[in-house]
């Protein structure tokens, strides 16, 4: 089982070999999880249950302007990359076009293969993420090629109320994956 060291963005040299018995489940997580080419033809389709997990917001700024799912995803990524990968806003913004191409190629074509959908968006998360990302986006210099992108996100965040409720977010919340303080990763 490969392991990625996200602090340097490379595969770690050590891994584990797993052996499963017939009654043991396998959970495949990640952008390729729904890709049918991932499993060998010997795998019995009747034993497979696929779940598509994504941030699929249904929130609106008003009666005419919805918050796009991509807005939630880029906020999550900006905060997570800064908090856990020591990545600047410019670095993450610079990778966003590649991330979107990867979604179009490796995720969206296979989402219909899912047997179930799990929406991970929380109603209050944009208000929480704003606290982390807003001041960092304000520091992107005007001469940066990502300045316009940063300003667009700041403009969007200006419509969002702040929420200082971190103490009330449980350590098992999906939001903790992005802001830190979760039960699962140290």
Describe the predicted segments one by one:
Residues 1-26, 87-99:
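ATP-dependent small-molecule kinase phosphotransfer cores
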Residues 25-29, 52:
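Structural recognition of the conserved hydrophobic beta-strand(s) that form the central parallel beta-sheet
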Residues 31-34:
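Short beta->alpha connector loops
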Residues 36-186:
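Conserved NTP phosphate-binding and transfer environment spanning the P-loop NTPase/kinase superfamily
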């Amino acid at each position: 089982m490969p392991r990625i060291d996200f602090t340097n963005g490379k595969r770690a040299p050590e891994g584990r070999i797993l052996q499963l018995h017939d009654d043991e489940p396998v959970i495949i997580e990640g952008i390729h999880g729904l890709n049918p080419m991932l499993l060998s033809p010997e795998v019995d389709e009747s034993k497979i249950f696929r779940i598509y997990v994504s941030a699929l917001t249904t929130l609106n700024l008003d009666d005419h302007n919805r918050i796009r799912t991509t807005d939630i995803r880029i906020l999550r990524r900006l905060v997570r990359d800064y908090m856990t990968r020591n990545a600047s806003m410019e670095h993450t913004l610079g990778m966003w076009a590649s991330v979107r191409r990867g979604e179009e190629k490796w995720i969206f074509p296979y989402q219909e293969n899912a047997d179930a959908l799990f929406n991970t968006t929380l109603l209050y998360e944009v208000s929480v993420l704003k606290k982390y990302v807003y001041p960092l986006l304000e520091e992107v210099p005007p001469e940066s090629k990502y300045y316009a992108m940063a300003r667009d996100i700041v403009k969007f965040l200006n419509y969002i109320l702040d929420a200082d409720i971190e103490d009330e977010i449980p350590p098992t919340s999906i939001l903790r994956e992005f802001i830190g303080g979760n039960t699962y990763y140290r």
